[in-house]
């Protein structure tokens, strides 16, 4: 059974504050909106079997709007849930089922392919979620704890050098660097030997703390070309954003699939801008690492997605010994199909964790 872990606490009217009529109409409005993406009018609700006149339904919808649960976009007389309304629906009305057996087998088969690197497996998991959920799949890689085993600089020609760092756990990090033409094989070997002597056995985090001293030593002991290789290599492995982890995003094109109105295009453009803020997104997913189940953020509940009004559904993936490795999830419009996406995220996280054990 999927365990839900809500996002930050936001004050919304409780279910106890709504009578049976209001609860029923509210539920129908939200369900219709999540299905169609369109504002919902009173006639749509009345056709659904509610034994009330359209006028009575409109009055109830107006009451729900005054409570901050529904809103009316300026282009339509219909109503749609606010982010606060979606939060109340998810917490109080949503019925989460299970992933279909066919989809379970597909997820397991795609993640069980042999011969892939760790990062390739994570990217595949992100792609799986983006395809099944209809949003953008996201996954944060674990913090590396294995020591450095080997460092090598490989010439690629055209003024490019591939910096390769192999870890004791078998994982590999490659960084492409630009170098002036004419870098000699001896300079590449000299730089590799220098770093191997000093970084072998250290974690990447430990190696980063020593970078300043290593650069000073390189400038004193190596020729100018080899010293520059060491300096550029250490800078490349520093992670750019100062984090030992990386963020993998797949399926951004899905976010454009049903962007119809200009307002939706503007929202998607803002979401693309949000997704480019990787350090902030990793920080948000760090909160997910502490959750015991699926965590849901809706619109303005996060500062990062407050302008685009997007939702994040994510879960930690962990080993069989409950050691949290990272987080995986889906980002999309606030009208995501929560009942479908929540169990998909939960199941994919569990399969990914089992694969990491194997």
Curated annotation (Swiss-Prot):
Keywords, alphabetical: Repressor, Stress response, Transcription, Transcription regulation
Pfam family membership, one: HrcA
Coiled-coil ranges (or none): none
Domain of life: Bacteria
Example GO molecular function: DNA binding
An annotated GO BP: negative regulation of DNA-templated transcription
Protein family: Belongs to the HrcA family.
Protein function: Negative regulator of class I heat shock genes (grpE-dnaK-dnaJ and groELS operons). Prevents heat-shock induction of these operons.
Name of this chain's protein: Heat-inducible transcription repressor HrcA
Organism: Caulobacter vibrioides (strain ATCC 19089 / CIP 103742 / CB 15)
